[in-house]
Amino acid sequence: MSLAAGLLAAASATSAAQSLAYVGGAQYATGDFVFTQRTWSAYFSNGLAWSAGRVRASAGIPLVVQPGGWLQYSGAGTVVPTGGMTGSTGGSGNNPGATGSGTHGTAMTPPDGIPFSRVGIGDPIGRIEWTLTADAAHPIVSVVGAAKAPLADVNSGYGTGRWDVGAGLSGAMHVAGASVFADAVYWKLGNPPGASIHDAVVYAISVGRALSLSPWTVVGTVSGASSLSAGVEAPLQAGMGVSYLLESGRSLLVTVGAGLTRTAPAFSTGLGWRIPLATE
């Protein structure tokens, strides 16, 4: 989802003095992550994106669907394979991220019998950017601040019950007819009950090229993060996307991705959209 959301946000940086848009997306991801069996998750996000001069801000709240409470989404946009959070069950002792689960080497066996709703509202996430360089002829560099508020019930499996806050840099530039976007944010992640999650650096780099005399743009991306738990490899994935810009200023982006490490989704696909609401 981060690919779709990020590229649509970048596309919203127009010459308009002020704009407001509805942004949303849907993503399906599947993989075994650090578990001994495969699982999946679907993520639906709805939010608003606002820009005025050098400032851009966005906020959204997700609806999450998954068959068991094995995965949780951090504010960094990364999947945290907790093994299921109950808010009262202690960890296994062998893996600090395996709350209430058994471990086999570096893999966790998901626990049985944890109360869990298949559909739930996740924690809302907000982001704000301040552009340092205003000259479009040169690379655009922005300071980024972000936060995830712990509003979802941790016992439902859809929230960590802790604040996540992040700060970093993002950039954009044109090279040989292509647009290059880069983003790196350090996240201080709150530990869910019974788990130990490391703070993380989350990064992404995307390259997009518009097809000649066409509203279509092809995009490639690589994204990842530092390790979230001791003994667990860092997630890394690659993806491709195709975006379509409508005359009304609306845009759509379809993506597919593949995990390059076990802790990333083995396969993911998503759809993102942006609909302008007001422009001055």
Predicted regions and their residues:
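Bacterial N-terminal signal peptides
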Residues: M1-A11
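Transmembrane beta-barrel domains of Gram-negative outer membranes and organellar outer membranes
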Residues: A16-A176, V180-N191, H198-G239, S248-T255, ...
